[in-house]
Amino acid sequence: MARAKFERTKDHVNIGTIGHVDHGKTTLTAAITMTLAELGGAKARKYEDIDAAPEEKARGITINTAHVEYETDSRHYAHVDCPGHADYVKNMITGAAQMDGAILVVSAADGPMPQTREHILLAKQVGVPKLVVFLNKKDMVDDEELLELVELEVRELLSDYDFPGDDIPIVAGSALKAIEGEKEYKDAILELMKAVDDYIDTPEREVDKPFLMAVEDVFSITGRGTVATGRIERGKVKVGEEISIVGIKDTRKATVTGVEMFQKTLEEGMAGDNVGLLLRGIQKEDIERGMVLAKPGSITPHTEFEGEVYVLKKEEGGRHTPFFANYRPQFYVRTTDVTGTIKSYTADDGSAVEMVMPGDRIKMTVELINPIAIEQGMRFAIREGGRTIGAGVVSKILK
């Protein structure tokens, strides 16, 4: 049988399952593929196939993640599921699997548990825009009132973390019963997917966002000017446009007089392209690796931020010893290392933390020695002598 060509006619959305261990995330993932497979929208995947997730590396960290894909009438989905709690934490913080929305799985028999709370907090911190809830194991709850209580509890918990708890769609069902083929429960899976279709927004495409390119290298071409090279992270750039050069030194403007890719001249470069941009009115010494070229006004330089960070264990190549306030590692942002001082650490409940151990997840306040173009939701690595000792995401800009 010839392989079907991938038709990009439907909107593409990245989602994932999150929630407490053993509440049924992987079973639900399997149930979605099996239920949609009957409608021709997926390849059925068994629990065992999904659970045996391959290892992958993101920002120097090994993570186990399973990727499945399926489609509904209106959309094509890429869905991530992680076997272990630590994998979720690492995945969400590194952004290895970017999520446009997530399905929070809560066992109706147990209600919200510690990791339910932790995953909701993480979703908020790393910028997952919308959640839909699946109350699993409904077949194990005889009392309708109990089901309503769990639903209320979940809605309150979501509101605690600034998600719109009253508006979030909650669908009750049983992933296992759906896999076993019971109609009522297969219908609940379809109802869940309808909620995901309707409630989780289609993300803005990278190419439609404001232009940004991190500078990787700079050289001058005699008689023509200065060229900055790098990969366009988002948006597009045309010959003749004015751009800002942001970070390290004072922000300044320049005009793009040429866009080149693989020795060919282009009219415009777009997200994903590796290009050289010829800039007018800029000397080679005015621009360096670590700066970004961006649409004027779209990004600003900052020195102080809060980050949600996963600190590598020593088995993962991280530090062997704890660290404290005023620790000064390098923060690897986009294309460059910037030294910064970690001023303080905070636990999930807002209390101050004195000492951070390898393997911890922690919120930290960082002050960089140079202003860099950073924004909320941006990923970074923490390095010491060239090796990665942590991964983080900017949760809040302070100044």
UniProtKB/Swiss-Prot annotation:
Residue numbers binding Mg(2+): 26
Region (G1): 19-26
Stretches the record annotates as G2: 60-64
Gene Ontology terms describing biological process: translational elongation
Region (G4): 136-139
GO cellular component: cytoplasm
EC number(s) stated in the UniProt entry for this protein: 3.6.5.3
Xref: Pfam families: GTP_EFTU, GTP_EFTU_D2, GTP_EFTU_D3
Sequence segments annotated as region (G3): 81-84
Enzymatic reactions: GTP + H2O = GDP + phosphate + H(+)
Listed NCBIfam families: EF-Tu (TIGR00485), PRK00049.1 (NF000766), PRK12735.1 (NF009372), PRK12736.1 (NF009373), small_GTP (TIGR00231)
Name this polypeptide is given: Elongation factor Tu
Organism field: Synechocystis sp. (strain ATCC 27184 / PCC 6803 / Kazusa)
UniProt lineage: Bacteria, Bacillati, Cyanobacteriota, Cyanophyceae, Synechococcales
